[in-house]
Amino acid sequence: MVDGTLLLLLSEALALTQTWAGSHSLKYFHTSVSRPGRGEPRFISVGYVDDTQFVRFDNDAASPRMVPRAPWMEQEGSEYWDRETRSARDTAQIFRVNLRTLRGYYNQSEAGSHTLQWMHGCDLGPDGRFLRGYEQFAYDGKDYLTLNEDLRSWTAVDTAAQISERKSNDACEAEHQRAYLEDTCVEWLHKYLEKGKETLLHLEPPKTHVTHHPISDHEATLRCWALGFYPAEITLTWQQDGEGHTQDTELVDTRPAGDGTFQKWAAVVVPSGEEQRYTCHVQHEGLPEPLTLRWKPASQPTIPIVGIIAGLVLLGSVVSGAVVAAVMWRKKSSGGKGRSYSKAEWSDSA
């Protein structure tokens, strides 16, 4: 199934200004999956400010257009959406050519389905200025080509990627991308933060508790829950007698709750009867100070936690991983700062 291969990543971020608390980043994820015998490849493009998806394009939609995914983007005029739609459609066509070219690089037949991914974005520092940029490309779920931290050179993972690296160097692609990341990306991130500040800049502290799950007569699992928090960055750790405890622990990835907030849990296996020696420590910027939790037998929830677990299992089947990467060639988009994300381009000559 095509949908199963379209992976979305919730972005990390860094601080903006002294007046805007929290972490902030702008990231775009583009994924194309070939469908032999079924027409054009499926192409999906999504944009995130921090942990919030704010735009989306899907060429399988009845009327393929870039559309808002956050209420604060609905105020944008038709000129913005027309421009972003054209750019997304152009990128979809470039991805189609890229898939064919990569298939040739790896000597693959036309019968199989292949996936091309591209991720790029920028982070801001505490002073509101550019802190770092990134761009990654992947083919069939594996790293292909990555722009290094200096934004001046590339890391190619194999001989096929080295072909792309040479072409990129000849076209001064790193220089073009660096200009976009350090300037245009930062400018648009500031604009989006201003437009969505009531949502993006708020803090929602986690609702926390610890549950107890017997494994046998000798062992039990303590699970520390953090629910309904925003932004997504959070730290859950277990300690035994005040010391860090990592043995027999399990930590799930932070997951969206579906209402704009996030969920996470961390579990530890403990000897029965020694539960009170273990404490869960929660750190989140929405909390005035870190929390320390213990299991409380008298207030152990029963039925409610079943619904929570079921919800997390369902979310785990939907949010299956991270998109990293995707197009091989890109040239600086015409119009410069007119676009909020850089346009991918490709030449299949070679």
UniProtKB/Swiss-Prot annotation:
SUPFAM superfamilies: Immunoglobulin, MHC antigen-recognition domain. It comes from the Eukaryota. The keyword Disulfide bond applies. Keywords: Disulfide bond, Glycoprotein, Immunity, Membrane, MHC I, Signal, Transmembrane, Transmembrane helix. The chain crosses the membrane at residues 306-329. One of its GO terms (molecular function) is peptide antigen binding. Residues 22-305 are extracellular. Disulfide bonds join 122-185, 224-280. CDD domains: IgC1_MHC_Ib_HLA-E. Residues 296-305 are annotated as: Connecting peptide. Glycans are attached at residue 107. Residues 330-350 are cytoplasmic. Residues 206-294 form the Ig-like C1-type domain. It is a single-pass type I membrane protein. It holds the Pfam family MHC_I. Residues 1-21 form the signal peptide. Residues 204-295 are annotated as: Alpha-3. GO terms for biological process: antigen processing and presentation of endogenous peptide antigen via MHC class I via ER pathway, TAP-independent; antigen processing and presentation of endogenous peptide antigen via MHC class Ib; immune response; positive regulation of T cell mediated cytotoxicity. Heterodimer of an alpha chain and a beta chain (beta-2-microglobulin). Belongs to the MHC class I family. PANTHER family: HLA CLASS I HISTOCOMPATIBILITY ANTIGEN, ALPHA CHAIN E (PTHR16675:SF164), MHC CLASS I-RELATED (PTHR16675). This is Patr class I histocompatibility antigen, alpha chain E. It comes from Pan troglodytes.
